[in-house]
């Protein structure tokens, strides 16, 4: 039943009469709404941007989308199997449970509201984009909200909704309606009704702004007529009682609305009017018992998009605490998409927002959904078949937690984070355009409604946690504007127009930033642009005019703010910061008229500014970006650089300038005065088409010192190089120093230059001048480069008859100048003939050169009476021959002369032509610079195919004849050569080496692998007597390295080697060989005898003996003896061990006995005690402690009561025992902890639950719940694959293990094994057969009466997967078994036998790992098992 409003009460409401007179001058709501309500701006921004590939992130489509019922029945368990959880991901700060919905982050403890994930912050974008957003306080509305709270007890504001009207709900149940001029139009409801219904918790206005829906904190819903202010419906039974209305939303259909309550349920409200009676039907779309929805957003379309094919589905997006759903309300209820969040901070707020965007030339809705710091964009499209497809676009990862997301247009979004900071983001580039604080708004929060405090707080803890930061009803957007509801005010934010953004920067005196922003507008690269024409030419014209205005203002400000006093450097720095900006933007705008007109005149008023201006032009001129400069500016530019002594800069500028802008007379005079030859050449060539005069001037600079034989200065060398480059450019048709000569002048210039070069005499020639002065000067300056210039020129003159004549003529001149004069070096003469040889060797050669000239050159280069420049002469002749000059010589005569002159490289060149490779060996051996290269040469000839057998045999024989010479040259290289190519002649080679030292070096390189020679000893098969011969030489020349060498040598006989070492009295080496032979006792006696002799030497030393040397010798021998005993004790019985250790102990204690009986103590008494203690510690591991003590006490000396002398030894033994016992216990404890951790980790891994990757069978690709034809079991594997048992049986993926059936994953096994599964379990461990751990039966969807899924196997038997994991654990700790270690430790700890010095033990006790020499404890953290 409808309830009519109390009209009289409405008229008497003080709120209706209170109208704020003072309106914000900067805010015109109606104009702004009309400006941003059209779609054209969105389309334009979207089409201008880079297109997004909507197929790149396409979400796979399923044949049969899930029904709403199936989704509602899904559990909201967020746990995922086989994921190692990071406890820090769920770090939630303490939340103030007493916060109210009207409290603001700024006015309360904002630190309790968010757990921000602070990553690196984005850079400040103010200088790039300026101020993008403009915010204004709606003073009229704000004042009336405060007035209503004071005068009519309306309460504080709680919700806002905006359309062409603005509706504000209050905590006492009133709805205040304002028009576009901020005038109060209606006050809906009353405080009495508010006391019954509670606060307004949600508002919604329909599309045509005719109806208002109000949701209340106690669950009621009212509908109002906004035209008349009448109450049309009061709905109390749309949803379960006791829950607050969190959201209420009109759809595009005015008869259909959606509401969401604090129970997490979503209901569809259908409004009908039958026979004048208004009714409301409610239908549950989502039950809160299956997952609480806390945010809903229907898709709204603008009037121009009413016919869009997607609007007929009436899409609705819902966000629960675990997933996003997109459903269609029409024509029938259908789920189109589900998207799970993944792991999120439970206190973060889910957000949804729709907007139509243009992608790939079509306009479609895009859904933005976010929670925490991640924003996802989903594009919704309809295909030709009528189905809806959802594709995922780029996501946005932020460094702050969001509480609101709002579209301004299709390119720009506004985000609000949990500390009330606003972020303006460009969606496609993800660039942050602006940030601003809005704490002054004192934003209203909806916490009390999410906690449902008005109805007793009967909500879940998860929803209450989300409600701490919920402000859904406090922010509303309409027509490109965003309204923020504060506790006492309403603010509106909108994008600034492009002019406003520039003006905002200009007001703050940020002229440089304003120009940069304007240029981005000009180039179409700016973001969030409002107010510019879409036509490119119009846009550039409008922006350019505005930039010119700013540039004038910028120039005036630069002149006004120039420091009046101070150093000139301060003024220069000021203008260097400002003037380049003016120059840059004038040139960018292509306004040279402005730059060299008004701007130059304005800046010329200040001399410093004028100088900086002229200097700013330099980089543009050098890069050819600025060519046309007015003559006056160019004149001032040259004068300025002249005054500052920057002549090189002037020269670089002139050659890039248009010649018409130069004062030629001024420039030529300046160039001559300051020797700016590049500029001079440029002016002569471009200004007067004169190419010869510059050469004459340059020749006058370098010719006199060259003719006088003087060394050129650096400046003269530079001039000569410039002259060569200039001649080369002229002959090649290129302009100097850059550009090209006009095509019509190229032949003329070439002829003029050739005629100039071959002149017989210069213009002002003296009587003493030699002929052809120009050619002579260039040859003296740089022969090689001048000839290179000519060679390049000859390449271009092939088809020119006159040029051919020039070639012959200049060659004749070159020969005449160089051959008939003796003032040229061999290198210069060689360069000439090399040049000639190359020209003569060409197939189209037309030159003629007398052959006798080459013979003269050969005689000149090979003259034996001149030893100077030997290498230079040889190199010149070699280049001449390689260039083709060999055809000009008689080869036999050439070889004779080269041998006579010791030109071995020439000889090699000639011998190689005649295939006399054996003679080349002599060339290498006789050439001290290349003698070591002979080995590579011999190896290449003998191994590389392409040489005949006779040639190889001759080289082989030649090398054999010179073997001793090769060995003396480099023994290691010779040994490698012999091992590779002369392995069968080793004894012959050894016989040739008469020098014993040389033979020793050769054999060491051949046999000792430590020498680095790559020799395969197995293929070499050296007889033992050669190895023994090397050992004997080693004993002679390097006795201290014998043992180390014997350890790596092979193929020697022990008896003969022992005789050799005994011959040279190398006792340690003999002992090593005896031990290797197996005579450990004989080796021990030999070392013991050596030790005793050294101890005797030390005891009878005199004052002149070096004590340290004797003590070092004793210590070294003792250490070797102890090592021998330790190596052999493991293989001996107790009696044999005592036979080794006790004589050693006796030998060490004997000198101490003698010193105790002597009157004066021995000087090394303490050192001997320390060494004796070392012996005791070493033998304690093999001899029982009682046996050692008994042996000591049986000594006649200590048996008579002199135990005090050995007290230190006994106490040291006991301390060692205590230390080792502590170490043993600590090791056992560590091993126990390590094993316990590993077993616990293994148990946790194999008992973890499984999570399927998909909900369909990986073989038949059908959903496991859809198979109705048979009661299949469902088999889930640890790899995540899921199968029907019938499908898996059809693929033969079963095997029998101990009489039980085991399953194997079809995908994993087929990708790792080629054939069928092996029946051998050990083979299955080698492959990657993933066993099943969970079975579910049956596969179809269970009804409520069906029994729960049963486990397949109840017996506690390890399946192959668990066995594989256990084997992996064993491999991690491969080596000595840890269980065996613990068993041994536990057995030995029982009694006295645990002591290392206990009495005789049985064999197994002394064969344990603790007695092994290489036993090591792996004291490292245990490996982390992969989940």
UniProtKB/Swiss-Prot annotation:
Bilayer-spanning residue ranges: none
Gene Ontology cellular-component annotations: CORVET complex; early endosome
Modified residues (Phosphoserine): 26, 32, 127
Region of interest called Disordered, as start-end residue ranges on this chain: 1311-1355
Residue stretches of biased makeup (Basic and acidic residues): 1343-1353
Any one Pfam family match given in the protein's UniProt record, by short name: TPR_Vps8
InterPro entries given in the database record: Vps41/Vps8, Vps8_central_dom, WD40/YVTN_repeat-like_dom_sf, WD40_repeat_dom_sf, WD40_rpt, Znf_RING, Znf_RING/FYVE/PHD, Znf_RING_Vps8
A single GO molecular function term of this UniProt record: zinc ion binding
GO biological process, one term: endosomal vesicle fusion
Zn finger intervals (RING-type): 1257-1309
Keywords attached to this entry: Metal-binding, Phosphoprotein, WD repeat, Zinc, Zinc-finger
WD repeats: 193-234
Biased composition (Polar residues): 1329-1342
Gene3D superfamilies in the record: YVTN repeat-like/Quinoprotein amine dehydrogenase, Zinc/RING finger domain, C3HC4 (zinc finger)
Record keyword Phosphoprotein present: yes
Keyword Zinc applies: yes
Subunit structure: Interacts with RAB5C. Interacts with TGFBRAP1. Component of the putative class C core vacuole/endosome tethering (CORVET) complex; the core of which is composed of the class C Vps proteins VPS11, VPS16, VPS18 and VPS33A, associated with VPS8 and TGFBRAP1.
Described purpose of this protein according to its UniProt entry: Plays a role in vesicle-mediated protein trafficking of the endocytic membrane transport pathway. Believed to act as a component of the putative CORVET endosomal tethering complexes which is proposed to be involved in the Rab5-to-Rab7 endosome conversion probably implicating MON1A/B, and via binding SNAREs and SNARE complexes to mediate tethering and docking events during SNARE-mediated membrane fusion. The CORVET complex is proposed to function as a Rab5 effector to mediate early endosome fusion probably in specific endosome subpopulations.
Family the entry assigns: Belongs to the VPS8 family.
Protein name in the entry: Vacuolar protein sorting-associated protein 8 homolog
Species this protein is from: Mus musculus (Mouse)
């Amino acid at each position: 039943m409808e309830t009519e409003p109390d009209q009289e009460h409405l008229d008497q409401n003080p709120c209706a009469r209170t109208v704020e007179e003072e309106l914000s001058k900067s805010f015109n709501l109606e104009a702004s709404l009309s400006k941003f309500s059209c779609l054209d701006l969105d389309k334009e921004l979207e089409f201008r941007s880079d297109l997004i590939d909507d197929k790149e992130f396409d979400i796979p489509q399923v044949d049969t989308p899930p029904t709403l019922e199936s989704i509602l029945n899904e559990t909201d368990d967020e746990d995922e199997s086989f994921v190692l959880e990071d406890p820090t991901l769920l770090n939630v700060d303490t939340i103030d449970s007493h916060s109210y919905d009207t409290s603001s982050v700024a006015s309360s403890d904002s630190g309790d509201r968010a757990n921000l994930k602070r990553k690196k912050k984005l850079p400040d974008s103010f200088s790039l984009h300026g101020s993008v957003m403009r915010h204004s306080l709606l003073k009229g509305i704000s004042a009336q909200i405060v007035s209503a709270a004071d005068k009519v007890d309306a309460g504080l504001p709680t919700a806002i909704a905006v359309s062409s009207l603005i509706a504000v709900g209050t905590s006492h149940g009133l709805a205040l309606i304002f028009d576009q001029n901020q005038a109060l139009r209606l006050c809906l409801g009353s405080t009495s009704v508010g006391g019954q219904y509670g606060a307004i918790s949600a508002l919604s206005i329909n599309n045509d702004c005719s109806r208002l829906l109000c949701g209340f904190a106690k669950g009621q819903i009212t509908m109002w007529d906004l035209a008349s202010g009448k109450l049309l419906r009061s709905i109390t039974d749309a949803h379960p009682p006791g829950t607050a209305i969190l959201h209420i939303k009109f759809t595009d259909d005015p008869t259909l609305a959606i509401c969401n309550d604090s129970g997490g349920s979503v209901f569809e409200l259908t409004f009908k009017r039958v026979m004048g009676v208004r009714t409301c039907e409610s239908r549950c779309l989502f039950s809160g018992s299956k997952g609480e929805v806390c945010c809903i957003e229907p898709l709204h379309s603008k009037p121009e998009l009413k016919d869009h094919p997607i609007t007929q589905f009436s899409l609705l997006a819902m966000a629960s605490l675990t997933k996003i759903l997109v459903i269609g309300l029409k024509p029938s209820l259908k789920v189109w998409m589900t998207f799970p969040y993944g792991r999120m901070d439970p206190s973060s707020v889910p957000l949804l927002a729709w907007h139509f965007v243009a992608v790939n030339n079509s306009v479609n809705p895009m859904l933005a959904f976010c929670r925490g710091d991640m924003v996802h964009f989903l594009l919704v499209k309809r295909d030709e078949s009528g189905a809806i497809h959802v594709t995922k676009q780029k996501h946005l990862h932020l460094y702050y937690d969001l509480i609101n997301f709002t579209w301004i247009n299709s390119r720009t979004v506004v985000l609000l984070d949990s500390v009330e900071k606003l972020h303006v983001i460009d969606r496609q580039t993800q660039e942050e355009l602006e940030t601003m604080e809005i704490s002054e708004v004192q934003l209203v929060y909806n916490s009390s409604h999410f906690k449902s405090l008005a109805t007793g707080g009967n909500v879940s803890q998860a929803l209450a946690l989300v409600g701490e930061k919920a402000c859904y009803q406090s922010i509303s957007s309409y027509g490109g504007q965003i309204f923020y509801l504060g506790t006492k005010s309403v603010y509106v934010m909108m994008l600034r127009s492009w002019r406003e953004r520039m003006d905002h920067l200009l007001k703050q005196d940020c002229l440089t930033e304003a120009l940069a922003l304007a240029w981005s507008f000009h180039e179409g690269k700016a973001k969030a642009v409002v107010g510019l024409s879409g036509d490119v030419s119009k846009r550039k014209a409008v922006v350019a005019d505005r930039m010119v205005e700013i540039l004038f203002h910028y120039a005036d400000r630069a002149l006004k703010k120039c420091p009046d006093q101070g150093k000139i450097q301060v003024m220069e720095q000021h203008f260097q910061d400002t003037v380049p900006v003016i120059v840059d933007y004038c040139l960018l705008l292509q306004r040279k008229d402005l730059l060299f007109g008004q701007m130059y005149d304005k800046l010329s008023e200040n001399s410093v500014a004028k100088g900086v201006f002229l200097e700013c032009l330099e980089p543009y001129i050098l890069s050819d970006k600025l060519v046309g400069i007015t003559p006056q500016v160019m004149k001032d530019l040259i004068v300025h650089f002249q005054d500052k002594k920057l002549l090189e800069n002037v020269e670089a500028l002139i050659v890039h300038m248009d010649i018409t802008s130069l004062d030629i007379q001024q420039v030529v005079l300046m160039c001559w005065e300051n020797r700016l030859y590049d500029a001079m050449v440029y002016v002569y060539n471009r200004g007067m088409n004169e190419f010869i005069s510059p050469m004459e001037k340059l020749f006058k600079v370098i010719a006199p010192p060259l003719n006088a034989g003087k060394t050129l200065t650096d400046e003269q060398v530079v001039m000569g190089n410039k002259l060569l480059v200039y001649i080369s450019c002229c002959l090649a048709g290129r302009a100097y120093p850059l550009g090209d000569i006009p095509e019509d002048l190229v032949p003329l210039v070439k002829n003029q230059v050739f005629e100039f070069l071959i002149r017989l005499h210069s213009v002002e020639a003296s009587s003493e001048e030699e002929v052809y002065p120009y050619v002579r000067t260039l040859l003296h300056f740089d022969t090689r480069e001048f000839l290179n210039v000519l060679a390049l020129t000859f390449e271009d003159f092939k088809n020119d008859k006159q040029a051919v004549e020039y070639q012959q003529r200049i060659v004749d001149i070159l020969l005449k100048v160089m051959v008939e004069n003796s003032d040229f070096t061999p290198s210069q003469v060689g360069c000439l003939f090399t040049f000639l040889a190359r020209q003569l060797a060409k197939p189209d050669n037309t030159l003629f050169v007398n052959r006798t000239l080459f013979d003269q050159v050969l005689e000149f280069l090979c003259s034996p009476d001149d030893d100077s420049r030997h290498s230079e002469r040889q190199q010149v002749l070699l280049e001449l021959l390689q260039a083709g000059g060999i055809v000009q010589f008689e080869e036999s005569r050439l070889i004779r002369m080269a041998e006579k002159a010791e030109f071995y490289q020439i000889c090699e060149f000639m011998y190689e032509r005649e295939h006399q490779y054996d003679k080349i060996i002599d060339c290498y051996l006789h050439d001290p610079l290349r003698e070591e290269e002979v080995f590579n040469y011999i190896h290449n000839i003998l191994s590389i195919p392409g040489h005949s057998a006779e040639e190889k045999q001759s080289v082989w024989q030649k090398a054999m004849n010179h073997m001793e010479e090769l060995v003396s040259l480099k023994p290691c290289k010779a040994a490698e050569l012999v091992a590779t190519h002369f392995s069968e002649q080793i004894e012959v080679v050894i016989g040739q080496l008469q020098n014993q030292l040389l033979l020793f070096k050769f054999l060491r390189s051949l046999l000792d692998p430590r020498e680095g020679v790559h020799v395969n000893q197995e293929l070499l098969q050296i007889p033992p007597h050669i190895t023994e011969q090397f050992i004997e030489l080693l004993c002679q020349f390097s006795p201290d390295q014998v043992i180390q060498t014997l350890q790596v040598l092979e193929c020697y006989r022990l008896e003969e080697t022992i005789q050799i070492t005994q011959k040279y009295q190398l006792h340690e080496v003999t002992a090593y060989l005896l031990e290797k032979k197996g005579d450990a006792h004989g080796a021990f006696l030999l070392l013991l005898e050596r030790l005793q002799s050294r101890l005797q030497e030390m005891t009878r030393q005199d004052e002149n003996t070096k004590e340290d040397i004797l003590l070092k010798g004793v210590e070294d021998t003792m250490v070797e003896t102890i090592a021998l005993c330790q190596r052999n004790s493991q293989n001996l019985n107790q009696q044999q061990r005592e036979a080794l250790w006790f004589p050693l102990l006796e030998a060490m204690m004997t000198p101490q006995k003698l010193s105790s009986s002597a009157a004066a103590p021995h000087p090394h008494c303490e050192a001997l005690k320390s060494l004796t203690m070392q012996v005791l510690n070493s033998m304690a591991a093999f001899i029982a402690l009682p046996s050692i003590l008994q042996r000591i006490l049986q000594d006649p000396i200590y048996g008579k009561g002199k135990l005090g002398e050995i007290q230190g030894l006994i106490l040291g033994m006991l301390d060692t025992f205590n230390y080792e016992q502590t170490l043993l216990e600590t090791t056992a404890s560590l091993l126990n902890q390590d094993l316990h951790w590993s077993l616990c980790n293994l148990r946790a891994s194999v008992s973890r639950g499984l999570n399927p990757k998909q909900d369909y069978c990986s073989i038949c690709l059908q959903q496991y719940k859809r198979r109705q034809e048979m009661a299949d079991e469902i088999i889930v594997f640890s790899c995540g694959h899921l199968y029907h048992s019938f499908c898996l049986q059809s693929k033969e993926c079963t095997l029998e293990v101990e009489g039980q059936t085991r399953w194997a994953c079809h995908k994993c096994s087929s990708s790792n094994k080629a054939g069928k599964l092996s029946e051998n379990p050990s083979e299955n461990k080698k492959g990657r057969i993933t066993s099943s751990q969970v079975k579910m039966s049956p596969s179809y969807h269970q009804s409520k009466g069906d029994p729960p899924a049963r486990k397949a196997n109840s017996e506690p038997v390890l399946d192959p997967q668990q066995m594989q994991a256990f084997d992996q654990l064993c491999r991690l700790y491969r080596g000595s078994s840890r269980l065996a270690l613990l068993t041994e430790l536990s057995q030995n700890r029982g009694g006295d036998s645990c002591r290392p010095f206990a009495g005789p033990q049985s064999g197994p006790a002394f064969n344990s790992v603790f007695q092994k020499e290489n036993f090591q404890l792996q004291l490292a953290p245990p490996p982390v098992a992969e989940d």
